[in-house]
């Protein structure tokens, strides 16, 4: 059999083999699939700098569009798993790398440089809580004046508080003296009592 005929026969067998083999067919004896060891799986998944794809999007103020070639680049960024859910993979060392990008602004084009950040060292650190990012409202001093309150006062909506009610101070003069009370005006003095007694005696003598 000629070498050319052997090649044609081998090519035909290779094309027919996948179609004839069932999907659930187990591996043939002696042909075991390669299994990645646990240590390799763990090492690949740890927090470390790894190559990631970063898209490049540029928006111009004008109406002329600028196209970047390539539209995305690959840089080293931190990523991977941490041993605890409360930890996250963060960069502890980074540097800037400059790349040449072809900028197309029709009908011309030119090479430009773009600076991107790359991570050189990574570490698993505790995740930042919301309280550490957002300021605590209780700790923030309020400059709004607080309304004055009097113990036992339960004011209705819109009613003034006793502490807010001011009483005018009387001006000095005759009007500043307190007027006699109703009780003192009705109580007779010594002269009035003597006159009443004399009138009573005269009335009795006439009778």
Swiss-Prot record:
It holds the Pfam family PDGF. Residues 174-207 have a biased composition (Low complexity). The keyword Signal applies. It is found in: Secreted. InterPro entries: Cystine-knot_cytokine, PD_growth_factor_CS, PDGF/VEGF_dom, PDGF/VEGF_growth_factor. It comes from the Eukaryota. One of its GO terms (cellular component) is extracellular space. VEGF-B186 is O-glycosylated. Residues 1-21 form the signal peptide. Growth factor for endothelial cells. VEGF-B167 binds heparin and neuropilin-1 whereas the binding to neuropilin-1 of VEGF-B186 is regulated by proteolysis. Belongs to the PDGF/VEGF growth factor family. This is Vascular endothelial growth factor B. It comes from Homo sapiens.
